[in-house]
Amino acid sequence: MAYTEAEARKLVILAAHRLVDAGLTARTWGNLSARISDEQFVITPSGLGYDIMEPEDLVVVNISDLSYEGNRKPSSEKGIHADAYRLRPEVNFVIHTHQDKASVYGIRGWDLSGLTASILGKRVPCAAYGLPGTEKLRQAVADALSANPSSQAVLMKAHGALCLGADCESAFQAAEELEKACAGRVGEVLDEELSMYREQRALWPMPDYGRSQRKGHFFKLKYGSVTRIYDLRNVPADGSSPAAIHAAIYRSTKARYIIHVRSASTVALSILGKTVHPYLDDLAQIAGPDVRCARFFDDRRLPRAVSRALLGRNAALLEDCGGFCIGKTADDVTAAASLLEKGCEAALYAKLLGDCEPLSPVDARLQRLVYQAGYSHKKGKKADAQAQPETAAEAEAETETVCEAAAATVEVATEAAAEALREGEPACSGG
């Protein structure tokens, strides 16, 4: 039974916080919706942080044509939600997540089969790949839903998952059970490998390069049990000390926060000493079109090597020592660190399987470019997330980011940008 609009608005906000608390998403990633009638649902808006989202911020969307009410734009994945309600009359709550294990398992493009006594059904299909917000992705998910009428979830290759339920609780149960099932399958491949790296790290502890925050010419650095404040103007440009590395990064980027990431999967990839190409959309968007690895050729030049690896990116690896993430806010750098960990786990999983391909360079560069151009500036900003009501012509004419745009508009932008990239035009850089 559909919710009243007031019930749906309150429930979606509560569910958004629950989603973050359960570790099934972060920031504005993913989206949630609730059916309010046979013709409409309410959905989270585009680019607004869950921490400041309120019931009145949700958007009412019409299932038949995706038109919407109010002065906020709905999630770019509104079409996927509409299809879920259209194809599944019994569904009243939909959650799209970027949950870790389901995302990693989905990079192969395989269905999750062999499930028994599961709320998910006997099989969870994996929808074919499509760029976020595009008609291609929407159609792929709709095809998966149509072909698997008993499944309560759909994996989205290189992206995340869609979980359905007759109510909020059953949709959450589907998300949690999906994560548990995918963790088991991923663990069958990764657990032994990661255990070996953890044992090596215990025997030969790697340096802790710490985390820091910059204010003006000064930065506060904490590594191990040490916390100190440094003046950028007085830190030597060479040497392998944590302070020298952080200072070099601050001098060459616009970062305000830095974190040294030492998770098992990140360390494992750093030992290979190679550039990591993203297998997941969110890593390409947030970290960069690839994650370079700074090499340990000369301790004195290490700060420069790390800072150069981070140019135009928000994450880089350091050979044998994990990785570094940077951001303009504490939230940005924490998000980059969590995505680097998940992305490295996906890359290691792909390496061990041997039959997975990363995102194409065009898709990875395009997602990074459009994320920097728009979506990253909107997160957490209520004023920026608002939009004046548009006519159909205005909506068609507006160019938006892949993550935010209406599906048809993004499809056009995607093709144009991809063609430009194929012709060799440089992608924009940031840091």
Regions found by a protein language model. Give the residues of each.
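Glycine-rich flexible loops
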Residues: M1-T391, C403-A406, V410-G431
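Low-complexity, intrinsically disordered Ser/Thr/Pro- and acidic-rich segments
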Residues: A395-T399
